Amino acid sequence: MSLEELETRVRKLSMRATDAKMNLHDLAEELPVDWEKIPETAEATFAVFKELTAARRALKAAKKAAEEA
């Protein structure tokens, strides 16, 4: 994946992570309504942040490799 593609991926994942975080926040604010949705919302939030962290690491490594080249 090119540096530009990695940067685009990180930006998109960052937006998804922000949306997931807000969904979890909104759910928490409305408790006890929809408390059954906590596991699925938390799992989705965890998954997107895990993916974002991996993409950020890949981008950082790619930038470092580009600097050394």
Per-region residue spans from a language model:
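Short, charge-rich amphipathic interface segments used for partner binding and complex assembly
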Residues: 29-65
